[in-house]
Amino acid sequence: YLSAILGFERFRAGQFGVRHYCTVGLNSKEANDEELAEAVMDILPRFALKEGVVAIGEIGYDEQTALEDRYFRAQLELAKETALPVLIHTPHRDKMRGTLRSLDVCEEHGIDPSLVIVDHNNEETIDTVLERGYWAAFSIYPSTKMGSERMVSLLTRYGAERVIVDSACDWGISEPLAVAKTAQLALERGVPRAAVELACYGNALAAYGQSGQMQESDWLDPASIDQTELYAGNSILRGGREPVIEAPKVRRTAGDLDIR
């Protein structure tokens, strides 16, 4: 799994002009399978140092068990050893208690809050996360977690300092354009453009850029695309499709995109 994320998936994204980054870690749900958890922890340090890894995560609590706590702490130490930021998963159940516990444990391990992105926040947790100096991230999902309307209300109330709007292309129902659509709604509701750009772009770059693996020039000065290239003998071409070959100068930029 980790080899695929850092290998073929990185290659596949690049073949379509997408710069691929990832976090690596043992998710709290899997931490309760001790045999699996030990196997993952044995190999994780090797993958944490790979190109394109911008944080250790998502880690944290789900059911808030002793095993989750053990592997959360172990991965915080790995983040310290590798000088990587941390991406924290806050639990879906008993979220406030799990969030407070996550922050307390980070501080027990001497992790600088500026290196920690706390994800899946809501109206209950935002005050504490921001007051204690952490990055407060919000996952925009259809029907669950945080929606665009609620997110815009939070931006209006709290501003954009250390706030990150994110989303996912999940295995289930998701909205890959949720961040862009939230940004558009925020602008329509009168949130200052500078604040929207921070919450939907700049803060994520600042937080994950601390890894040394992500910088704006990666996409402002992108590599060329050559879909004739192979990865371990594998091509992204299917069904007789003609390969795309583009030099950087003909690539689209953010100014060419019109998201409605």
Language-model region placement:
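Mid-domain alpha/beta scaffold segments of enzyme catalytic cores
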Residues: Y1-A83, I88, R93, L100-R101, ...
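Conserved, mostly hydrophobic/aromatic
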Residues: C22, E58, A79, A136, ...
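Active-site neighborhood of phospho(di)ester-bond hydrolases with catalytic His/Asp-centered motifs
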Residues: T23-G25, I56-G57, V116-N121, A137-S139, ...
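Active-site glycine- and acidic-residue-rich loops that bind
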Residues: E30-E38, S139-S148
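Glycine-enriched alpha-helix->loop->beta-strand junction motifs that scaffold or abut catalytic
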Residues: G52-V53, A74-Q75, K80-P85, C106-P113, ...
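Histidine/acidic-residue-rich catalytic or RNA/ligand-binding cores of hydrolases
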Residues: A66, M96-L103, I126-R132, K145-T156, ...
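Short acidic/histidine-rich active-site segments
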Residues: Y158-P176, V196
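Mid-to-C-terminal alpha-helical segments outside catalytic/metal-binding sites
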Residues: A180-R260
